[in-house]
Amino acid sequence: MKAIFTLLTLLSFSNTEAQQTRYIVKFKDKATNTFSIANPSAYLSPRALQRRVRYNIAIDSTDLPVTTRYVDSVRLAGTVTILNSSKWLNQVTIKTTDAVALAKINAFAFVKSTAAVAARLGDNGLPINKKLDTAIEEPINDITNKTNLVSSTNGDVAAYGRASGQIKLHQGEFLHEHGFKGEGMQISVLDGGFFRYLTLPTFDSVRANNQIINVWDFVANNNSVDEDDAHGMNCLSTIAANMPGVFVGTAPKASFCLYRTEDVATETNIEEHNLAAGFEKADSIGVDVCTVSLGYTRFDYSNQNYTYTNMDGNTSMSAIAADIAASKGMLPVIACGNEGNTSWRYVSSPGDADSVMTVGAVDTLGNVASFSSYGPSSDGQIKPTLAATGLRAVIASPSTGLPVFSNGTSFATPNIAGLTTCLWQAYPEVNNMSILDAMQKASSRFIAPNDRVGYGVPDMKKAFVILMSRGYKQNFCVDKNKANVQLKFKFDHTMTVLIERKLSNQNIFTNYKTINGTAGFTEKTITFIENFLPLQGLTASYKVTVRIANDTSFVISAFDINQYQTCTPPVDEVSINPNPVLDVANISISRKQNTNINIQMVNALGQLMHNITYQHKAGTQVQFINMKSMSKGVYFVSIFAEGKKIKTVKILKG
């Protein structure tokens, strides 16, 4: 199996008899490190540090580069070339045929292990059977026909061309029409090469606007990926294409980092190490979303093979690295795999990681692609997480740059990664797990997930509304028979806020106040005063409705006020931070009235780890759960109010 998820016919390559030349050297610690946790600017960019501050993510030892002295000692042990290092896995890959050097490296006190991982018959740093065309592609007739456009509600035309179906499936045009096309966001694409991205017309706009901000080849160790395999270019095109009326991607205004981590001519777990290094580089730059259309199950050397049992999110190098990437605040979006019709059948790694968005494939009508890998992961996680178009997906041809059809979870993955990026652009104040949770809740099978599409096909408009509602805050105080009411949430000039009121002696709501939004999707404050003297003791009920353009309307809040009330908390709400958590989870609970609260935490096996019951007084209180001694992994915190479960939150212990 090749680790690139398109339905291709690949040339076979066997090097099982070749001499091992590449090894992973794993270190025991990071002692005598020349870098310091106290000075992260030495190894993390300002943007990466801003992300840590924004989402309350601590700098820890995994952020420190591998100890320089260790790396130098390995290099100087003999005829040894250092290939790549991984600070998260605390290891380096090396190239050598020097047996004496290997023995010396194994004897170092700071070396935990040395393992042979790969051989290369060629030594030019390029794939032996490099694919210059991603092959089984189906041309699209009349590709310049512009009748298949998406008409927006505000009169503009989003000229998606042939990509219309794979965007409309998710109502992705809703985000674009409101100005969210990825601008200011960064996406890393980790793949096997980006053939001709420097010249294909698909990326004219990206090149003209300098949207490619970083490039690195972790296989050849150089900064050129234009001459390698076309698969990464195909994936990139589903996000970055900007050919109005012909082919437009899901986040055409985003900035991109292109990383070649996969050697398509071989299949060894050195590529998992490369993937970890790619994640780390993306993190250090400050990338928001990583899209990975790669996966690992079986290798050229059978002793490296995984079994389905290993697909537990905690075994493979790539899954461990993907989860660490999530703990740093990025959102990894991973292909589920194309094993649905094979003996393997199930999700591959790193799609089994527990803190990533794993993507299955459907067509533009939402029908499951038979090749899309099945879930769950071996530890019972719902996999895939969700699904997007990967059956007859529209991608760029490597020969012309024009749109063609192709198949694979490879293309479903970047497609939804781009839309997720646009959603996050609208709500940068929320973290990666909040975005992932909103996407799940906005999907077609959220109530009844299955092993083919997980939570289903996400609706970006619904996810947008979910996050808008979560950001809503309200407060009111009654003083001297007057209620001062304050509402805060994000909205813009395309939106209208309708406040309706009904008194306790009335049967219907009537219009009370209408507020037209102003430019810029930012948090805005609505205030009004209710004078209770004329109401003679009646209770006033309010309903706050948001209208978006001409086709979306939803109630964001409903509340009651009477002249006998005192100040209230904004709404009944629960928030947990930080997430991921290292030591202590802070659980903030706001209630409008005194409430009996029970908080329970269980691990991934359902074992009860924490249980507390207390009387919560009206207002906001914070409870703390010390998780320092708990094992790394996924936990679920459930909040019960008066015996009824009101919220369950998945948190990651890093």
Predicted regions and their residues:
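Residue-level detector of functionally pivotal "anchor" positions at catalytic/ligand-binding pockets or at interdomain
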Residues: V465-N481, D551-N577, K592
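C-terminal outer-membrane/trafficking sorting elements
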Residues: L7, E17-A18, V497-T514, Q536, ...
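Inhibitory N-terminal propeptides of secreted protease zymogens
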Residues: Q19-N141
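C-terminal subdomain of the subtilisin-like protease fold in secreted/lumenal serine endopeptidases
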Residues: S164, I285-T291, Q425-K480, N516
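Hydrolase catalytic cores
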Residues: L236, Y259-D263, D288, Y346, ...
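N-terminal domain-start motif of subtilase-like serine proteases
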Residues: I82-S86, D98-L102, L126-V189, T199, ...
